[in-house]
Structure formats: C-alpha cells, structure tokens
C-alpha cells in the first residue's frame, strides 16, 4: 500500500516543530524538490487567497480546501480555467459547539498547465 508522506510544511506562524515559518508566496520550486503536490487549507479572504492561487499552482499541482461556492464567483473564473478537479466533501465543523456549520467545502486541484475541463466528484 502506498502511503503519503509530508515532505514540506510551512505556515505564517509557528505551529509544529517541523514547520517552517514563512509566507507561502515566498516558496520556490527548489524548496519543493521531491514533492509531488501542494496541499493547503488557505485563508478564504480574497486579499490573502488570490496571491496563493497566483503562486502555488505555478510550483506544483496544488489542492486547496475552499468553500464550495467559490467556484461560482466571477473573480474565480480565470482560476477555474486551471482547475483540474473539484471534489465535494460537504459541511465541515471546525470546532465542537452547538452551532453546526452551514458552509459546504470542496477540494480544488489547480495546475498552471491544465487545459482540459474541470472534473467534478460529488459526495
């Protein structure tokens, strides 16, 4: 059985011992030698998300965990042209509390060189 291995980890703040503290827009291809893809749970605000959408898929195919409805926003149009996959995962609950989440989420796979239709996988 193949097992995924994390070969690079970073965040803008200190999280765990093996995580590098840096802005993701400063990551270079050379830093990702041996990595097959990037997987991220990015900030959802457009001012922070847009630079990541512009940069990370130029380095490696990148999976973003995002609210599912972002694909319907006009400003996402150019990015959806580079979106290979959308995999629906439904509602996520970030914290245990009495209020349940109301936002559906999906994994979006972006790649700079993608030129085909986006593939959708429902739940």
Regions found by a protein language model. Name each.
Residues 1-123:
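Class I S-adenosyl-L-methionine-dependent methyltransferase catalytic core
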